[in-house]
Amino acid sequence: MYTEEPNQEGERRITVNRNGQTDIVAVAHKTPPGLNKDTYSFHLLSKILADGKSSRLQKALIDPGLATSLFMYDFPFKDNGLFISYAFLNPGENHKNIEEIILNTYKEIIDNGISDDELQRAKAQTKASVAFSRDGSYAVASAINEALAIGDWTFYTTFIKKINSVTKNDIKSVANKYLIDNKKTTGWFVSNNNETN
């Protein structure tokens, strides 16, 4: 028997209070199955948002000293997946403020799209990371196996070609379609050592 998760109907939130040293804000949105054409736009969007010193969330959160690090998760699956931004807060920073900055960064792309430079940089980063990840027979076998798990081995062979075909409008369209409240789940990890949030 094979079942599918029902469509999400409205925003979800969770706060975890436990012992720890680093507070975290995570903002997740539902994504389509990995073989959907929007997967490639999501991959590039994750690069634009959080990969490298020129990424938008780096400039919005790391450079001003609001967060110590970022992590973006957008791994494709056979079923629906998640597009998640994680921000690891500097001591004393406010969870709500960090969440708003992440969402405002999304909204800027929803409203105004991305630049040509951002698109080309994201594609170059992707090509480099894919080449590195396919270095060696074990790595190639593992990547093909992942493609099979998603549902089609040609996901491996056509990935870069489809990345190259993504346009600025594709990324803006994906942001408008998926980065919405009805597909959003927000999580806060609040350390018991931090009483400021």
Q: Where are the predicted features?
A:
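Non-catalytic beta-strand/loop surface segments
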Residues: M1-N36, K47-K96, E118-A128, A139-A143, ...
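Hydrophobic alpha-helical membrane-association signature
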Residues: I98-I102
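A common structural junction motif
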Residues: L103-I114
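C-terminal soluble interaction/assembly domains
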Residues: I110, A122, Y156-T157
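C-terminal, helix-dominated tail/subdomain
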Residues: N145-D152, I163
